[in-house]
Amino acid sequence: MPNLKAIRDRIKTIKDTRKITEAMRLVAAAKVRRAQEQVMASRPFADRLAQVLYGLQTRLRFEDANLPLLAKRPVKTVALLVVTGDRGLCGGYNTNVIRRAKERTEELEAEGIKYTLVIVGRKAAQYFQRRDYPIDAVYSGLEQIPSASEAGQIANELLSLFLSETVDRVELIYTKFVSLISSKPVVQTLLPLDPQGLEAADDEIFRLTTRASHLEVNREKVTSNLPALPPDMIFEQDPVQILDALLPLYLSNQLLRALQEAAASELAARMTAMNNASDNAQTLIGTLTLSYNKARQAAITQEILEVVAGAEALR
């Protein structure tokens, strides 16, 4: 016969665990909203910066401008910026990014191209350091919602590698925020910058909304109308110098948005994982409660039978 106290203790333990997973789910949901608000808050600056860069690039289209960040050269070495989280309990979020990064290193090796890793997040650092991958820098302990200063610090490291010609291309591997139950690791080229990319093609903004007591994500396509600068605009400095100064800022801004989206993906994955854990705990509590009631009923029945048997024996 099952031990009633053991079942009762197990039910209590699972209920306590469910309280923790439910609290973590609610915290993750609140932080996803904060990540969304950060993206929305930086949107006007990003749009204006893209407008100025596009206008300058259009103005200089027929000039022989020397812009190192736009210069393409034969690729011998690639820097891979791999973005994961510092913590677990987020489903397959970290594993999927690490797997995609490993696949990319194998693709580069097959092409005879060297690579080095710049890692954001403790999980990826632990994985690749343990396996002796070439690592240039590791950034961990970042704020859960990345800040502009953190993105700028990472961007400066990437700029240093690219401008010193230590690497010929910089690629970003991060998780694109698709929905609360879906995320997709993607590979994106950061350097050299593509002038055509200044038109914000395929750009999207995500919004976390509530419908019928459930959280869902709406994605909104961004269509940027980037007019050319007025032809009679007079620059106090050389337009080439202005563009050369703004391109690092544009890179930092693009990196910040990618880090924010990766953070939102991690939080959404954690929210989903904790929601599943809470549901599983509730199911297990129901099963154990049923087992407890059956065992208790069997114990009561057994006691009644023993009392009846004892009474019969005394006759």
Curated annotation (Swiss-Prot):
The keyword Ion transport applies. GO terms for molecular function: ATP binding; proton-transporting ATP synthase activity, rotational mechanism. InterPro entries: ATP_synth_F1_ATPase_gsu (IPR035968), ATP_synth_F1_gsu (IPR000131), ATP_synth_F1_gsu_CS (IPR023632). SUPFAM superfamilies: ATP synthase (F1-ATPase), gamma subunit. It is found in: Cellular thylakoid membrane. One of its GO terms (cellular component) is proton-transporting ATP synthase complex. It is a peripheral membrane protein. CDD domains: F1-ATPase_gamma. Its main location: membrane. Keywords: ATP synthesis, CF(1), Hydrogen ion transport, Ion transport, Membrane, Thylakoid, Transport. Produces ATP from ADP in the presence of a proton gradient across the membrane. The gamma chain is believed to be important in regulating ATPase activity and the flow of protons through the CF(0) complex. Belongs to the ATPase gamma chain family. F-type ATPases have 2 components, CF(1) - the catalytic core - and CF(0) - the membrane proton channel. CF(1) has five subunits: alpha(3), beta(3), gamma(1), delta(1), epsilon(1). CF(0) has three main subunits: a, b and c. PANTHER family: ATP SYNTHASE GAMMA CHAIN (PTHR11693), ATP SYNTHASE GAMMA CHAIN, CHLOROPLASTIC (PTHR11693:SF41). This is ATP synthase gamma chain. It comes from Synechococcus sp. (strain PCC 6716).
